[in-house]
A protein has these predicted regions:
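Pepsin/retropepsin-fold aspartyl endopeptidases
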Residues: 1-140
């Protein structure tokens, strides 16, 4: 059995907190750790990221209320909606459109992740390799 070789950009996935994390880079070069969940249809940034980037996010986003949830929880909360948020994953540009940013503290976030990412990233590419042995995500 052959597997996809490790890309030149190296490993960009880690397993921590019993969950997969993607190492990404924001447009300003800042390193981000994002919870990677293929069961998640839309990406979002957590309050911790908002708190550290409040002025720039407030300037480019629009406030709105959303209702959503997950396993055994439904909430309505205020978010900031960004028209576009660009990152790089393994040196590959990714654009996340209509990104929700959590502006309220106190949710279930327990790690130091900047946010969550899932199928809205995966669906942008023709070929996505998730190699858990070598711990990398390759987007083509």
């Amino acid at each position: 059995v052959s597997s996809t070789p490790l890309p030149a950009s190296g490993r960009n996935m880690i397993l921590t907190d019993r969950a997969l994390k993607i190492k990404a880079e924001a447009n300003n070069g800042e390193r981000l750790k994002l919870h990677f969940d293929t069961g998640c249809s839309t990406a979002g940034l957590y309050y911790r990221y908002y708190e550290g980037h409040k002025s720039e996010l407030d300037a480019s986003g629009k406030r709105e209320h959303i209702t959503g949830g997950g396993f055994n929880i439904v909430v309505t909360k205020e978010i900031l909606r960004l028209p576009s948020f660009r990152i790089k994953v393994g040196k590959v540009p990714v654009e996340l459109k209509n990104l929700a940013v959590d502006t309220t503290n106190g949710d279930f976030q327990t790690s130091d992740d900047a946010g969550i990412i899932g199928m809205d990233m995966v669906n942008q590419f023709d070929c996505v390799t998730i190699n858990l042995k070598e711990m990398f995500l390759k987007l083509e």
